[in-house]
Amino acid sequence: PRPTRPDKARRLGYKAKQGYVIYRVRVRRGGRKRPVPKGATYGKPVHHGVNQLKFARSLQSVAEERAGRHCGALRVLNSYWVGEDSTYKFFEVILIDPFHKRIRRNPDTQWITKPVHKHREMRGLTSAGRKSRGLGKGHKFHHTIGGSRRAAWRRRNTLQLHRYR
C-alpha cells in the first residue's frame, strides 16, 4: 500500500518508485512478561520479578524486526508511527528490494544492496534500533563512546599498568 504519512515516509528515505515496499505492522502494547513456567524464577529474590518488567527495545524496533523476518529478501530502511489504540501500536516499515534494478543502478540507494546490510533491523542498525543502544552525538551519549555501552564500560574498567621506560 501507499504510505499513510507520505511526508514522514519521504523524510525517512521512501521514494514512490519500484523497489520500495511499505508494510503496516501491529504490535501489542505494554511491558514484557518474563516467560517462565508458573512464575517460577530461581535464584535471589532480586531476580524474582515476572510482571512489571520493561523490554530493552522499543515497540517500533520490534515492529521493524517482525517485518524483516516476514520479508527475508527485503532490507528494512526505516519505520514510523501511524497510530495506536488501547491494545496495539501501529507502525509502517519502509522496505527495499535489494535486487531491483531501480535500486541497484541508483548510486544513492545501492549502498543497501551490499551484503553487510542484510537484516539491519536484527542488529540494531536502524534509527529505532540505535536509540535503544544509546548511540548518538553530543554530551548525552557519552556512555557509549567507543561503539557501545559494553565497549565504554570495558575501557573505563580496564586497569592499564604502563611499563616504566
UniProtKB/Swiss-Prot annotation:
A GO BP entry: cytoplasmic translation
GO molecular function term, any single one: RNA binding
Keywords: Cytoplasm, Ribonucleoprotein, Ribosomal protein
Keyword Membrane tagged: no
Subcellular location: Cytoplasm
Cellular component GO terms held in the UniProt record: cytosolic large ribosomal subunit
Residue numbers spanned by region Disordered: 126-147
One Pfam family matching this protein: Ribosomal_L15e
Domain of life: Eukaryota
Compositionally biased tracts (Basic residues): 130-143
Physiological role: Component of the large ribosomal subunit. The ribosome is a large ribonucleoprotein complex responsible for the synthesis of proteins in the cell.
UniProt name for this protein: Large ribosomal subunit protein eL15
Biological source species: Gallus gallus (Chicken)
Phylogenetic lineage: Eukaryota, Metazoa, Chordata, Craniata, Vertebrata
Gene giving rise to this polypeptide: RPL15
